[in-house]
Amino acid sequence: ALSMLKDMPVAYNLNLIVLDREGRCALVETLDGRMAVKAIDSDSGEQALYATNHPVLEELIPYEPKAFVHSIRRYDNITAFLERHKKGITAGQLKDFFLTPYPEGLSCSYYSQFFGTTKTMVLDPVRGSLSLCWGGRPENGWHDFNFSDPFPQETAAIEIHNQTADPSIFAYRSLV
């Protein structure tokens, strides 16, 4: 996957995490035609890669040295969550954290301001499964899928609640 990504022309900025069933994982960031990659495996000292909506790899930060306050806060929330759970994280703990509303967690409901959680996924590459929750709300339930089974073609009614964000979360803050 990494070799294919390195040759792929990407015309927008993204943070992408790719992983496989052998315990290899990479954070791939693109920014204005540039690409940076950080890879880990089961033998690496670092055992987690994560990103929000700003560059986190040192090679790209000079090209985008500021980020929205909400992106930095969510990144810091992930860092703190991982620090609190050094001995291991269950899927249930991860799901609860993902659905915790911002600013304490990651879930955002500011849809009219173009900033809302549309879906939350927990993937298990070893088992070949994923759990999905629409709208970042526990009321919508988690739906489990196995990669070896056909994905159902279906629609579902979900509940979302639009809120208005404090404008300060859209301010830019320096990353350096």
Residue map of PLM features:
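C-terminal, well-structured catalytic/ligand-binding subdomain of enzymes
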Residues: 2-176
